[in-house]
Structure formats: structure tokens, C-alpha cells
A protein has these predicted regions:
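Catalytic loop of short-chain dehydrogenase/reductase
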Residues: 83-84, 128-154, 159-168, 180
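Amphipathic alpha-helical dimer-interface segment in Rossmann-like NAD(P)H-dependent oxidoreductases
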Residues: 71, 105-126, 163-164, 216, ...
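Catalytic Tyr-X3-Lys loop
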Residues: 92-111, 126, 130, 155, ...
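Conserved glycine-rich cofactor-binding loop
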Residues: 9-10
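C-terminal substrate-recognition "lid" of short-chain dehydrogenase/reductases
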Residues: 208-232, 237
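Short, small/polar-rich loop/turn modules that mediate ligand/substrate recognition or access, typified
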Residues: 167, 172, 225-227
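Conserved glycine-rich Rossmann-like NAD(P)H-binding loop of the short-chain dehydrogenase/reductase
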Residues: 24-40
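Conserved mid-core segment of classical short-chain dehydrogenase/reductases
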Residues: 67, 82-100, 123, 143-147, ...
Length: 239
């Protein structure tokens, strides 16, 4: 299968690319923004993979990629990329531009890429879309997460719309809701991590590799699995 992973050169995205690339039946395409060295190391490890440098904050860069994407036969799309940070200020201290910028850089590109992939999936009567969001959308998000959590909440509803509209075309759309992980994206200090561990049922943080395993599960699941959300949080937020 041809699988596209956005934001695939580092952190969770890299773990997903590595896990999916273990199967020789998969051709994994992934985007990266600035970390060419990391992208090259993945290509050395998995020669069948392909990397595309895309800046999701740049309309021209996205436009060029979407044009290239039209010629590719993407069977599975993993929407993972996020431009920016999760932690911010409280709502009353956050400039309105931070909300509009986050929407422009994270939601619009995702919609653009997803629309393009769906057009090909419709023709082939098959497709899987897996959206990486956050467990914060099913619980009260931490203080300062209003920008990040709001963009992810939009993607959550967008995914549900896709699952309904394209089920008859054998296209599924599901979400993975991971809890906090330690990656390049992480912003908590040692003290904050320690406090988090005190209340964690397993006394250990989630790893990117564990989340990647759930993505592989969704990839191999029946097309009956559609419109669902899988929280990965040790049962801390029961849906």
C-alpha cells in the first residue's frame, strides 16, 4: 500500500514511518519541513520510502505538494503534522492572531491534503484516513492549551464528516487520541513530568512507538472500523 504520513521525520511521525516501513508491502511517503538530516536517515534505513519537503506554513509550498500529490496513488493518509507548540497562554492573554495562525497552518493544509487524497480514493473505491489528534479533546485540556486543543477538535469533527460522507466509497476516517508523550514537541520540565507521573495509572508515559502500533492496527483493520476514536491514555479519560 502507498501510505502518506505528514510530519514524518521526527517525534511521533518518525515512529509511525518506521513502524509502517517494517512491512515490505508498504511504500511510505512522508513530509518533513526542516530536518533534512533526519529525513535522509529514514531513507537510508528504508530505501523504498520517499520524502517530500513541505512547509505547512507556506501556501506556495503546500500548493506545490498538493499538485504533486494528485499524481500519487495514496491508499492511506496519516494526518500527523502540527506546526507550532501545544502550550501557550491563558485564553485572555492569547492574541487572536495565534488562533487564526494555528488554524491557517494546521487545519487548512490538512483539509487541502485530505481533499486531494480523497479524490483518488473515490476513484479506486478504497482508502483509509487516520488523524492523530489528542486525548485533550475528550477531557478538559490543560491550562494554556486552548489554541492547540481547538485545532485538534476541528480535525476530530472533520474526520467524522469524512467517515459519513465516504463510507459508501469504501473510505474510512478514524482518529487516534494519544496522551502526553516525551518527544521533540514536549514542553514540560522534570518537575511537571514528575507530578504527571504521580497520578498516571501505569506510572509511565506513553511512547511514540506505542502510538505507532495503534496506527498499524488501524491500517490493518476491517473497513467496518470507521468514524471511531481510539484514546491511548491508560484509561484516564473514559469516553
Amino acid at each position: 500500500m502507498n501510505i502518506l504520513v505528514t510530519g514524518g521525520s521526527s517525534g511521533l511521525g518518525r515512529a509511525i514511518v518506521e513502524k509502517l516501513s517494517e512491512s515490505h508491502e508498504n511504500v511510505v511517503l512522508f513530509t518533513y519541513c526542516c530536518n533534512q538530516e533526519s529525513a535522509n536517515s529514514l531513507l537510508e534505513k528504508f530505501p523504498n520510502d520517499r520524502a517530500f519537503q513541505v512547509d505547512f506554513c507556506n501556501e506556495d509550498s503546500i500548493g506545490k505538494f498538493v499538485k504533486d500529490l494528485e499524481a500519487m496513488q495514496v491508499d492511506v493518509l496519516v494526518n500527523n503534522a502540527y506546526a507550532g507548540t501545544a502550550q501557550g497562554a491563558r485564553v485572555h492573554q492569547t492574541d487572536i492572531s495565534e488562533y487564526t495562525t494555528a488554524f491557517k497552518n494546521n487545519v487548512i493544509p490538512l483539509i487541502n491534503v485530505t481533499q486531494t487524497c480523497i479524490k483518488g480514493m473515490r476513484k479506486r473505491k478504497f482508502g483509509k484516513i487516520i488523524n492523530i489528534i489528542t486525548s485533550s479533546v475528550i477531557d478538559t485540556p490543560p491550562i494554556g492549551y486552548s489554541v492547540y486543543a481547538s485545532t485538534k477538535a476541528y480535525i476530530r469533527q472533520f474526520s467524522k464528516s469524512i467517515s459519513k460522507e465516504y463510507a459508501s466509497f469504501n473510505i474510512t476516517s478514524n482518529c487516534v487520541l494519544p496522551d502526553y508523550m516525551t518527544t521533540d514537541f514536549s514542553i514540560l520540565d522534570e518537575y511537571q513530568l514528575g507530578k504527571m507521573m504521580e497520578t498516571h495509572p501505569l506510572k509511565k508515559l506513553l511512547t511514540p512507538e506505542e502510538v505507532a502500533s495503534i496506527v498499524v492496527y488501524m491500517l490493518n483493520a476491517s473497513q467496518q472500523l470507521n468514524g471511531v476514536e481510539i484514546p491511548i491514555n491508560a484509561g484516564q479519560h473514559i469516553v
